[in-house]
Amino acid sequence: MEMSAQRLASNRTSPQSPSNSDYTWEYEYYEIGPVSFEGLKAHKYSIVIGFWVGLAVFVIFMFFVLTLLTKTGAPHQDNAESSERRFRMNSFVSDFGKPLESDKVFSRQGNEESRSLFHCYINEVEHLDRVKVCHQTTAIDSDVHLQEASRSSGRPEEELARFMKFDIPNFVNTEQSSFGEDDLLISEAPVLLENKPVSQTSRIDLD
Protein backbone atom coordinates (compact mmCIF):
# COMPACT_ATOMS: atom_id res chain seq x y z
CA MET A 1 0.00 0.00 0.00
CA GLU A 2 1.12 3.47 -0.82
CA MET A 3 1.36 6.07 1.87
CA SER A 4 1.08 9.65 0.76
CA ALA A 5 2.40 11.10 3.93
CA GLN A 6 3.95 9.57 6.96
CA ARG A 7 5.14 11.38 9.92
CA LEU A 8 7.05 9.84 12.70
CA ALA A 9 6.90 11.82 15.84
CA SER A 10 8.77 10.39 18.65
CA ASN A 11 8.78 12.10 21.88
CA ARG A 12 11.01 10.46 24.29
CA THR A 13 10.86 11.95 27.67
CA SER A 14 13.02 10.87 30.44
CA PRO A 15 12.18 13.24 33.22
CA GLN A 16 14.70 13.82 35.78
CA SER A 17 13.60 12.00 38.85
CA PRO A 18 15.30 10.78 41.86
CA SER A 19 17.63 7.81 41.57
CA ASN A 20 15.16 5.33 42.95
CA SER A 21 12.74 5.73 39.85
CA ASP A 22 13.60 3.32 37.01
CA TYR A 23 10.65 4.08 34.62
CA THR A 24 11.02 5.49 31.12
CA TRP A 25 8.18 6.56 28.75
CA GLU A 26 8.43 6.40 24.99
CA TYR A 27 5.74 7.64 22.53
CA GLU A 28 5.58 6.91 18.75
CA TYR A 29 2.96 8.46 16.43
CA TYR A 30 2.26 7.25 12.86
CA GLU A 31 0.10 9.13 10.38
CA ILE A 32 -1.28 6.88 7.56
CA GLY A 33 -2.52 8.34 4.31
CA PRO A 34 -5.90 7.56 2.65
CA VAL A 35 -6.49 3.95 1.44
CA SER A 36 -7.30 3.39 -2.28
CA PHE A 37 -9.39 0.31 -3.46
CA GLU A 38 -8.21 0.44 -7.06
CA GLY A 39 -6.12 -2.70 -6.65
CA LEU A 40 -9.15 -4.84 -5.65
CA LYS A 41 -10.87 -4.57 -9.07
CA ALA A 42 -8.52 -7.16 -10.53
CA HIS A 43 -9.65 -9.72 -7.90
CA LYS A 44 -13.34 -9.32 -8.82
CA TYR A 45 -12.72 -9.97 -12.51
CA SER A 46 -10.42 -12.89 -11.73
CA ILE A 47 -13.25 -14.62 -9.80
CA VAL A 48 -15.64 -14.25 -12.75
CA ILE A 49 -13.05 -15.48 -15.22
CA GLY A 50 -12.21 -18.48 -13.07
CA PHE A 51 -15.91 -19.44 -12.82
CA TRP A 52 -16.43 -19.43 -16.59
CA VAL A 53 -13.17 -21.28 -17.25
CA GLY A 54 -14.11 -24.01 -14.77
CA LEU A 55 -17.56 -24.36 -16.35
CA ALA A 56 -16.03 -24.72 -19.81
CA VAL A 57 -13.60 -27.41 -18.59
CA PHE A 58 -16.47 -29.34 -16.97
CA VAL A 59 -18.54 -29.24 -20.18
CA ILE A 60 -15.61 -30.47 -22.27
CA PHE A 61 -14.95 -33.31 -19.82
CA MET A 62 -18.59 -34.44 -19.92
CA PHE A 63 -18.53 -34.30 -23.73
CA PHE A 64 -15.57 -36.68 -23.87
CA VAL A 65 -17.20 -39.03 -21.35
CA LEU A 66 -20.41 -39.21 -23.41
CA THR A 67 -18.50 -39.87 -26.62
CA LEU A 68 -16.64 -42.75 -24.97
CA LEU A 69 -19.91 -44.24 -23.70
CA THR A 70 -21.52 -44.05 -27.13
CA LYS A 71 -18.51 -45.76 -28.76
CA THR A 72 -18.47 -48.64 -26.28
CA GLY A 73 -22.24 -49.13 -26.46
CA ALA A 74 -24.45 -51.21 -24.18
CA PRO A 75 -23.03 -54.10 -22.12
CA HIS A 76 -22.59 -57.39 -23.98
CA GLN A 77 -25.21 -60.13 -23.81
CA ASP A 78 -22.65 -62.54 -22.40
CA ASN A 79 -22.36 -60.41 -19.31
CA ALA A 80 -26.14 -60.26 -18.98
CA GLU A 81 -26.44 -64.04 -19.36
CA SER A 82 -23.69 -64.64 -16.82
CA SER A 83 -25.46 -62.36 -14.34
CA GLU A 84 -28.74 -64.20 -14.92
CA ARG A 85 -27.01 -67.55 -14.38
CA ARG A 86 -25.47 -66.31 -11.17
CA PHE A 87 -28.86 -65.08 -9.99
CA ARG A 88 -30.41 -68.47 -10.78
CA MET A 89 -27.65 -70.32 -8.99
CA ASN A 90 -28.03 -68.10 -5.96
CA SER A 91 -31.78 -68.62 -5.94
CA PHE A 92 -31.28 -72.38 -6.34
CA VAL A 93 -28.84 -72.46 -3.43
CA SER A 94 -31.19 -70.42 -1.26
CA ASP A 95 -34.10 -72.69 -2.15
CA PHE A 96 -32.01 -75.83 -1.65
CA GLY A 97 -31.39 -74.84 1.94
CA LYS A 98 -35.15 -74.85 2.58
CA PRO A 99 -36.47 -78.43 2.20
CA LEU A 100 -39.82 -77.59 3.72
CA GLU A 101 -40.75 -75.30 0.86
CA SER A 102 -39.85 -77.98 -1.71
CA ASP A 103 -42.02 -80.47 0.17
CA LYS A 104 -44.85 -77.98 0.02
CA VAL A 105 -44.38 -77.60 -3.72
CA PHE A 106 -44.45 -81.37 -4.28
CA SER A 107 -47.52 -81.70 -2.08
CA ARG A 108 -49.26 -78.97 -4.07
CA GLN A 109 -48.44 -80.72 -7.34
CA GLY A 110 -49.72 -84.02 -5.94
CA ASN A 111 -52.94 -82.39 -4.79
CA GLU A 112 -53.47 -80.81 -8.21
CA GLU A 113 -52.89 -84.16 -9.96
CA SER A 114 -55.27 -85.96 -7.62
CA ARG A 115 -57.91 -83.29 -8.21
CA SER A 116 -57.54 -83.62 -11.97
CA LEU A 117 -57.84 -87.43 -11.77
CA PHE A 118 -60.88 -87.10 -9.54
CA HIS A 119 -62.54 -84.74 -12.03
CA CYS A 120 -61.78 -87.15 -14.88
CA TYR A 121 -63.31 -90.03 -12.89
CA ILE A 122 -66.42 -87.97 -12.17
CA ASN A 123 -66.77 -87.07 -15.85
CA GLU A 124 -66.47 -90.74 -16.87
CA VAL A 125 -69.07 -91.78 -14.29
CA GLU A 126 -71.44 -89.08 -15.52
CA HIS A 127 -70.90 -90.24 -19.11
CA LEU A 128 -71.69 -93.85 -18.18
CA ASP A 129 -74.80 -92.74 -16.30
CA ARG A 130 -75.97 -90.83 -19.36
CA VAL A 131 -75.44 -93.89 -21.55
CA LYS A 132 -77.40 -96.05 -19.11
CA VAL A 133 -80.24 -93.52 -19.04
CA CYS A 134 -80.32 -93.51 -22.85
CA HIS A 135 -80.50 -97.31 -22.92
CA GLN A 136 -83.29 -97.27 -20.35
CA THR A 137 -85.26 -94.71 -22.31
CA THR A 138 -84.86 -96.71 -25.51
CA ALA A 139 -85.96 -99.88 -23.72
CA ILE A 140 -89.01 -98.10 -22.34
CA ASP A 141 -89.86 -96.78 -25.80
CA SER A 142 -89.58 -100.28 -27.27
CA ASP A 143 -91.83 -101.64 -24.52
CA VAL A 144 -94.40 -98.95 -25.23
CA HIS A 145 -94.32 -99.74 -28.96
CA LEU A 146 -94.75 -103.45 -28.27
CA GLN A 147 -97.68 -102.79 -25.94
CA GLU A 148 -99.35 -100.60 -28.54
CA ALA A 149 -98.77 -103.25 -31.19
CA SER A 150 -100.22 -105.95 -28.97
CA ARG A 151 -103.26 -103.85 -28.24
CA SER A 152 -103.88 -103.21 -31.92
CA SER A 153 -103.26 -106.82 -32.99
CA GLY A 154 -104.94 -108.49 -30.02
CA ARG A 155 -102.13 -111.03 -29.43
CA PRO A 156 -101.96 -112.84 -26.08
CA GLU A 157 -99.79 -111.61 -23.24
CA GLU A 158 -97.40 -114.56 -23.56
CA GLU A 159 -96.04 -113.24 -26.85
CA LEU A 160 -95.60 -109.83 -25.25
CA ALA A 161 -93.62 -111.40 -22.44
CA ARG A 162 -91.34 -113.01 -25.03
CA PHE A 163 -90.71 -109.67 -26.72
CA MET A 164 -90.13 -107.99 -23.35
CA LYS A 165 -87.14 -110.25 -22.73
CA PHE A 166 -85.27 -108.67 -25.63
CA ASP A 167 -84.16 -105.03 -25.04
CA ILE A 168 -83.39 -103.89 -28.56
CA PRO A 169 -82.25 -100.26 -28.73
CA ASN A 170 -83.46 -98.04 -31.57
CA PHE A 171 -80.00 -96.61 -32.29
CA VAL A 172 -76.51 -97.89 -33.02
CA ASN A 173 -73.46 -96.38 -31.34
CA THR A 174 -71.04 -95.80 -34.21
CA GLU A 175 -68.12 -94.97 -31.90
CA GLN A 176 -68.04 -98.38 -30.18
CA SER A 177 -69.14 -100.53 -33.13
CA SER A 178 -66.55 -101.89 -35.56
CA PHE A 179 -68.82 -101.79 -38.63
CA GLY A 180 -68.33 -99.27 -41.37
CA GLU A 181 -70.82 -96.74 -42.62
CA ASP A 182 -71.80 -98.97 -45.52
CA ASP A 183 -72.58 -101.90 -43.22
CA LEU A 184 -75.10 -99.90 -41.21
CA LEU A 185 -78.57 -100.34 -42.64
CA ILE A 186 -81.55 -98.25 -41.79
CA SER A 187 -84.06 -100.48 -40.08
CA GLU A 188 -87.52 -100.30 -41.48
CA ALA A 189 -90.60 -100.00 -39.35
CA PRO A 190 -92.02 -103.38 -38.31
CA VAL A 191 -94.97 -104.56 -40.32
CA LEU A 192 -97.86 -105.42 -38.07
CA LEU A 193 -100.20 -108.09 -39.33
CA GLU A 194 -103.76 -107.93 -38.23
CA ASN A 195 -105.86 -110.95 -37.39
CA LYS A 196 -106.73 -112.04 -40.93
CA PRO A 197 -107.22 -115.54 -42.28
CA VAL A 198 -104.33 -117.19 -44.09
CA SER A 199 -106.22 -117.32 -47.36
CA GLN A 200 -106.52 -113.52 -47.51
CA THR A 201 -102.80 -113.01 -46.89
CA SER A 202 -101.88 -115.55 -49.57
CA ARG A 203 -104.15 -113.80 -52.04
CA ILE A 204 -102.51 -110.48 -51.32
CA ASP A 205 -99.08 -111.99 -51.89
CA LEU A 206 -100.16 -113.56 -55.18
CA ASP A 207 -101.58 -110.30 -56.44
From Swiss-Prot:
Its main location: membrane. It is found in: Cell membrane; Endoplasmic reticulum membrane. The chain crosses the membrane at residues 47-67. Residues 7-21 have a biased composition (Polar residues). One of its GO terms (biological process) is negative regulation of protein localization to plasma membrane. Predominantly expressed in the brain, mainly in the pons and cerebellum but also in regions involved in energy homeostasis, such as the hypothalamus and brainstem. GO terms for molecular function: corticotropin hormone receptor binding; identical protein binding; signaling receptor regulator activity; type 1 melanocortin receptor binding; type 3 melanocortin receptor binding; type 4 melanocortin receptor binding; type 5 melanocortin receptor binding. The modification Phosphoserine is found at residue 91. Keywords: Cell membrane, Endoplasmic reticulum, Glycoprotein, Membrane, Phosphoprotein, Transmembrane, Transmembrane helix. GO terms for cellular component: endoplasmic reticulum membrane; plasma membrane. Disruption phenotype: Obesity. Mice are normal at birth, with normal weight gain and post-weaning food intake during early life, although young males trend toward greater weight and food intake with advancing age. Mice of both genders gradually become extremely obese on a diet of regular chow ad libitum. Glycans are attached at residue 11. It is a single-pass membrane protein. Residues 1-21 are annotated as: Disordered. It comes from the Eukaryota. The keyword Plastid does not apply. Modulator of melanocortin receptor 4 (MC4R), a receptor involved in energy homeostasis. Plays a central role in the control of energy homeostasis and body weight regulation by increasing ligand-sensitivity of MC4R and MC4R-mediated generation of cAMP. May also act as a negative regulator of MC2R: competes with MRAP for binding to MC2R and impairs the binding of corticotropin (ACTH) to MC2R. May also regulate activity of other melanocortin receptors (MC1R, MC3R and MC5R); however, additional evidence is required in vivo. Belongs to the MRAP family. Homodimer and heterodimer. Forms antiparallel homodimers and heterodimers with MRAP. Interacts with MC1R, MC2R, MC3R and MC5R. Interacts with MC4R. This is Melanocortin-2 receptor accessory protein 2. It comes from Mus musculus (Mouse). The gene is Mrap2.
